[in-house]
């Protein structure tokens, strides 16, 4: 495989990181470095009927599969293209009804196995890195992660054994471990979850907490654009995680999911950490121990809320958010990332409950510190401006709505590219109000 298989880029051995991607020519902010079609992808069950199962296009009037009546498509072409993969699920969904419930990871892995059988040769998604070359980090998995893989394998056999030939057990363990480390979540313009996918060439990029590129999606196509000036010889870095949090939290997440500690500029200098864990300016400032205790409380409540989402009512969830903010505000400023995390969750609950004023109130508090804590071209900041803009428009404040939507567009033109359908849709929203 030629190093220049992707124009102006090459695969190389990155010191201390293993494989990586390097620029051979300059790329300016907003430039598209490359795009990569999904090797395999799966639409999340909750988006069925809103997005095409094959190309993920969002549109009205999708046609449903005549057999299962659960998969929806743009047209006959999309349905035909998806059939070799949809047939793995179609009749099972009919037979099992409510009892058909494989996880998204299991569904994606089933599609990867089917794709490998249908298309054993290298695909256009693998110009620089093949799926079989993915890291699995098997030797680093703890018992909990190993048990999860075993239950995924059991589900794969339960739901797909009629329609798929499986490799041996140890190969399946490796494949699930590879998917866990190299899978991508496809999100829409408001960062809502649309599905999961494998993009081999995108997975070649290493991580940095000050990335020089950003990955966005156009349907099932991943696009990689520069968010900093990139010079010939520079390594191309993306971010694997949410960059809102302080260094210790980011590295905990990286170690848990990807088995490494980041040593980028942001992690070695910890320049942003003080502002991220901003403490209230009181006449008698909180002691170091009180701050440490509150950070510990914040991390615990974040985890508690994550679990509570699965079984508590919206009003109970909102109460957790409000009580935790009240407790943290005795030590933390509103701009503290742990406060922001709970405000963001509260905003999400308000949106779910259609409490537009409540959601707007939280969004207004969040946006300024978000703009400070995140990189300049951040999808988190763009999606927050977008939510605010749409809330203002819905509440008949056109001037504020237009201003917020234009701020979202300014970021998205760099991150998504000026011709992205999302941008046309937002411009249409502004004009139609």
UniProtKB/Swiss-Prot annotation:
Tissue and organ expression note: Highly expressed in heart, skeletal muscle and brain tissue. During cardiac development, it is differentially expressed with highest expression in the neonatal heart while very low expression is detected at 12.5 dpc and adult. Specifically expressed in cardiomyocytes (at protein level).
Catalytic activity: L-lysyl(4)-[histone H3] + 3 S-adenosyl-L-methionine = N(6),N(6),N(6)-trimethyl-L-lysyl(4)-[histone H3] + 3 S-adenosyl-L-homocysteine + 3 H(+); L-lysyl-[protein] + S-adenosyl-L-methionine = N(6)-methyl-L-lysyl-[protein] + S-adenosyl-L-homocysteine + H(+)
Keyword Cytoplasm: yes
Residue ranges that the Swiss-Prot or TrEMBL entry lists as coiled coil: none
Main location: cytoplasm
Binding annotation for Zn(2+) 2: 65, 68, 86, 90
MYND-type Zn finger ranges: 52-90
Ranges for domain SET: 7-241
Top-level taxon in the UniProt lineage: Eukaryota
EC number: 2.1.1.-, 2.1.1.354
Chain positions recorded as Zn(2+) 1 binding sites: 52, 55, 74, 78
One GO CC term on file: nucleus
Effect annotated for changing residue 240 to F: Abolishes methyltransferase activity
Record-linked Gene3D superfamilies: 6.10.140.2220, SET domain, Tetratricopeptide repeat domain
Molecular function as annotated in GO: histone H3K36 methyltransferase activity; histone H3K4 trimethyltransferase activity; p53 binding; protein-lysine N-methyltransferase activity; RNA polymerase II complex binding; zinc ion binding
Keywords for this protein: Chromatin regulator, Cytoplasm, Metal-binding, Methyltransferase, Nucleus, Phosphoprotein, S-adenosyl-L-methionine, Transcription, Transcription regulation, Transferase, Zinc, Zinc-finger
Residue positions, PTM Phosphoserine: 283
EC category: transferase
Binding site for S-adenosyl-L-methionine: 17-19, 137, 206-207, 258-260
Purpose: Protein-lysine N-methyltransferase that methylates both histones and non-histone proteins, including p53/TP53 and RB1. Specifically trimethylates histone H3 'Lys-4' (H3K4me3) in vivo. The activity requires interaction with HSP90alpha. Shows even higher methyltransferase activity on p53/TP53. Monomethylates 'Lys-370' of p53/TP53, leading to decreased DNA-binding activity and subsequent transcriptional regulation activity of p53/TP53. Monomethylates RB1 at 'Lys-860'.
Protein family (similarity comment): Belongs to the class V-like SAM-binding methyltransferase superfamily.
Other facts noted in the record for this chain: Although specifically expressed in cardiomyocytes, a conditional deletion in heart does not lead to any visible phenotype.
Full protein name: N-lysine methyltransferase SMYD2
Gene source species: Mus musculus
Encoding gene, per UniProt annotation: Smyd2
């Amino acid at each position: 495989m030629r190093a220049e298989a992707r124009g102006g880029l090459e695969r190389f051995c990155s010191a201390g990181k293993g494989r990586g991607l390097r620029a051979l020519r300059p790329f300016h902010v907003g430039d598209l470095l490359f795009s990569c079609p999904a090797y395999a992808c799966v639409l999340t069950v909750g988006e069925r009927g809103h997005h095409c199962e094959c190309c993920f296009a969002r549109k009205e009037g999708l046609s449903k599969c005549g057999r299962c009546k659960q998969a929806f498509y743009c047209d006959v072409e999309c349905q035909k293209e998806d059939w070799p993969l949809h047939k793995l699920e179609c009749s099972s969904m009919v037979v099992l009804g409510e009892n058909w419930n494989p996880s998204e990871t299991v569904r994606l892995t089933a599609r990867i196995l089917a794709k490998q059988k249908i298309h054993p040769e290298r695909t256009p998604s693998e110009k620089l890195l093949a799926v079989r070359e993915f890291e699995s980090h098997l030797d680093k998995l703890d018992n909990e992660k190993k048990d999860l893989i075993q239950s995924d394998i059991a589900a794969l056999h339960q739901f797909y054994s009629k329609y798929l030939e499986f490799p041996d057990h140890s190969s399946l363990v490796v494949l699930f471990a590879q998917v866990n480390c190299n899978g991508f979540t496809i999100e829409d313009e408001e960062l809502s979850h649309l599905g999961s996918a494998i993009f081999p060439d995108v997975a070649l990029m290493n991580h940095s907490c000050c990335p020089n590129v950003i990955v966005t999606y156009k349907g099932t196509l991943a696009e990689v654009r520069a968010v900093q000036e990139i010079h010939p010889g520079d390594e191309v870095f993306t971010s694997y995680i949410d960059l809102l949090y302080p260094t210790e939290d980011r590295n905990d997440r990286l170690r848990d999911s990807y088995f490494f500690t980041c040593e980028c500029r942001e992690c070695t200098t910890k320049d942003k950490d003080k502002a991220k864990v901003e403490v209230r300016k009181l006449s008698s400032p909180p002691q170091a121990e009180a701050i440490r205790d509150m950070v510990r409380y914040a991390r615990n409540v974040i985890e508690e809320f994550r679990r509570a989402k699965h079984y508590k009512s919206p009003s109970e969830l909102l109460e957790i958010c409000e009580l935790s903010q009240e407790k943290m505000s005795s030590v933390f400023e509103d701009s503290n990332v742990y406060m922001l995390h709970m405000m963001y969750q509260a905003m999400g609950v308000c949106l779910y409950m259609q409490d537009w004023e409540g959601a707007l109130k939280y969004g207004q508090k969040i946006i300024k510190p978000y703009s400070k804590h995140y990189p300049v071209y951040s999808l988190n900041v763009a999606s927050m401006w977008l939510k605010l803009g749409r809330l203002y428009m819905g509440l008949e404040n056109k001037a504020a709505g237009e201003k917020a939507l234009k701020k979202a567009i300014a970021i998205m033109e760099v991150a998504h590219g000026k011709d992205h359908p999302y941008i046309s849709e937002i411009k249409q929203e502004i004009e139609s109000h």
